[in-house]
A protein has these predicted regions:
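The feature captures the beta-strand-to-loop junction immediately N-terminal to the Walker
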Residues: 54-56
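Conserved ABC ATPase "signature" region
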Residues: 119, 130-148, 195-199
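Helix-to-loop junction immediately C-terminal to a conserved catalytic motif
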Residues: 69
């Protein structure tokens, strides 16, 4: 019987030794109704690194994540991105610095084709028509969606929509991409495919903090993972495989 090699989720060694932290949080605290739902979260994410925030519903991981991306304002603590204190920055200012956000929900235009979805973002950038076309083709190829480039988003499968959503989030070449529970609602058969979609961009040095309410899908790709319970980060989880 032919032996199938185990998936390689390892981070490139050059990215470990030659780059510093892209993202850092210092003592993040969020209080709702007199209760600290997040109580002193410290986190660092380096270039080319995937860091998982793990925990059950209500543990504080999503609130921590939302404070990082700018959806929720912390009561205290700081968020540092590329050397800039962005704690009080709205999402659009963080995006201008290169902080990308990938929500759980589909963020695509359903009535546009796959390539039109990508070009819609490219048209907001200071690029020539030729440069926009080249970048679009580059992303279509990178995510294996060239053959469906002319298909409308309405006709796509769940996996194809996920590919398009991630491709759109990388159009502007962000320094970090923050997928919010990327495995939520994903068919078990498609988990490996989504893991690859999350892992591949880090080969270019992209920093990837991510959240998940189960460890099974995230632990194999995270380096490291931080379990969160009752608003606090527990001991660091095992490294990615």
């Amino acid at each position: 019987m032919e032996t199938v090699a185990a998936p390689d989720f390892a981070r490139p060694a050059s990215l470990v030794s030659e780059t510093g932290n892209v993202l850092e949080t210092q003592g993040l605290v969020k209080i709702y109704d007199g209760r600290a739902v997040v109580n002193g979260i410290d986190l660092t994410v380096g270039s080319g690194e995937i860091v998982g925030l793990l925990g059950k519903n209500g543990a504080g991981k999503t609130t921590s994540f939302y404070m990082i991306v700018g959806l929720v304002r912390p009561n205290s603590g700081r968020v540092i991105f590329s050397g800039t204190d962005v704690t009080n920055y709205p999402m659009y200012k963080r995006a201008r610095l290169g902080m990308g956000y990938l929500p759980q929900e589909e963020s695509i235009f359903r009535k546009l084709t796959v390539e039109q979805n990508i070009l819609a973002i490219l048209e907001t950038m200071p690029l020539s028509k030729k440069e926009r076309r080249h970048r679009c083709e580059e992303l279509l190829h990178q995510f294996g969606i060239e053959r469906i480039a002319k298909n409308t988003a309405l006709t796509l499968s769940g996996g194809e929509k996920r590919r398009l959503t991630i491709a759109r989030s990388l159009v502007t070449r962000p320094k970090s991409l923050m997928p919010d529970e990327p495995f939520s609602g994903v068919d078990p058969i498609a988990v490996y495919d989504v893991q690859q979609l999350v892992v591949n961009p880090r080969k270019t040095g992209l920093a990837l903090p991510t959240t998940d309410h189960t460890a099974r899908e995230t632990l194999p790709i995270a380096d490291p993972a931080h379990p969160i319970d009752e608003g606090q980060a527990a001991s660091e989880g095992r490294k990615g495989l």
